[in-house]
């Protein structure tokens, strides 16, 4: 008979119903409504309709004919009074059997099972058969009796097709009910009597949620092993979850790690059986969560995969590491932070959060901070997690430690960091590090930095401080164990201030510099200034290239497409083919890796500019000033020798002698002139000594800074920045593979 689809109210699924079921439903509705004179109503509808054709054809005609079948059923039922008694008997027998099969009944046997043979085909309103009811209520002895004694009434074909209204097979029902004994019985029957094709078809049947039996196998290790090779591991339910995904996210099982490992191995074997490699992307759900996102422990089984994007975001923008940090999965954090493919500071697009923003526990911060140290410029220190407590800003600092643990994470007030930078600046006034810039930026920190734009500035500042203190530790300007706690920093600052105050001032014993020494210093500084200026220009070009490389690549792609279109229109095939061989570098570099390299280049450029400015001041201000005063000093000496050729040296103002009155007057004028020249020569000599001493000290410190800078520059650009850029770029590009 034809089947029709019943339209249900909003919120309910449509249900397909055949004609036999529809008539039974109609009979039930008539009985419940206690409708009288049913035949009269039918006669009226058939003969007194405004349009007689409407009662014979179409939907209304189908409804009238169904009502006629119901009336005939009642007439036939009334004629044969034995049917009522038979129906009542069957009803009582069914009720008795269901009472024995109910979960409230402690008995697990039916002694007179043969008396119920004629009602073993019963199904309830959920579509459950007698077998399904036995399974659901854990009546396994009765189930075995029925299957063994009435094998002809329940052939394997019927067992394979036995489903409830929601599409649950007997095996699904047994797993859902936790009846593992019944499940093993059914599996044994299937394995013994079914072909592989039938097994695959049965095990991968889905219910109304598109779930197969494998989606419910979250604790049943033995069953998983017995049917695992027949499971379609790529089959997704209505939430987009594969069986493997469902097992991975079932956290309440006692043998979670073993279950996960077994399921993964079986799935891997299934892929190989189908001549393919395990594809990680097959197991992403409708929310963008991957297997890495949901795995609670034992992630090394996934990290061994080559085609694995460990930085993949779900639709909320969360990476697997962010999920682990949020839910404090320490073993996963420990494993994933050791993987070189990890991009630690990947940002959640909607909130601009990094994994550090989800960390609420010190042990978690320490774990991810250790990876930050390893990724830092020289692998010595890492600033992260700026927090506000009342009006004070604090930051977590993870650094290399000499203690029992290789790394230590401490919370330090930003004002303490600011004071530390000031102390270092006083000890190293010619440092190439732009410490004054960082001191000013720390002064401007406030709670408004919690906005998205503010977070960008804070992140940039923390990166700069990380680079700065990495260089200071690399050059041994500060002790390695300085950041064990805030008290250590304050103590070191006090000791350092005390030592600085005890040092004698260079102004007390100024050094006399000779022109030859100044010439040597000038030549040395000019050579270094030229080299630094050349390198600074190269850094400037590199910075601009990094900023515009992707934009220029896009422009080039657009221009190439235009040329390609023109080439297609050329009649000459040789000329046309010339437009097809251009290879571009479009999308060769990820924005994330370019941004990281750009940050390091900017830092190196800032350091270069800072050092260049110090050299420039000495080379183009201090030394020319010394030569100017030296020329004046020589001119004064020349004037003195010319005016007083017989004087060995200029007299002091205290020298006196007896003179005649007129001769004394002339001599007095002469002595006054000599004394003026002597004072000028003395002042010029003092100025030369001060300038010379200043240049000498500056030269010594600049020479040391230039040496430190060269060492830092090579390590920063070659060994760290470029290697980190390549590593990050490869990690990001793997996402697109």
Swiss-Prot record:
It comes from the Eukaryota. InterPro entries: Ankyrin_rpt-contain_sf, UPF0507/Ank_repeat_27, VPS9, VPS9_dom_sf. SUPFAM superfamilies: Pseudo ankyrin repeat-like, VPS9 domain. Pfam families: VPS9. Residues 1-83 form the VPS9 domain. Belongs to the UPF0507 family. This is UPF0507 protein YML002W.
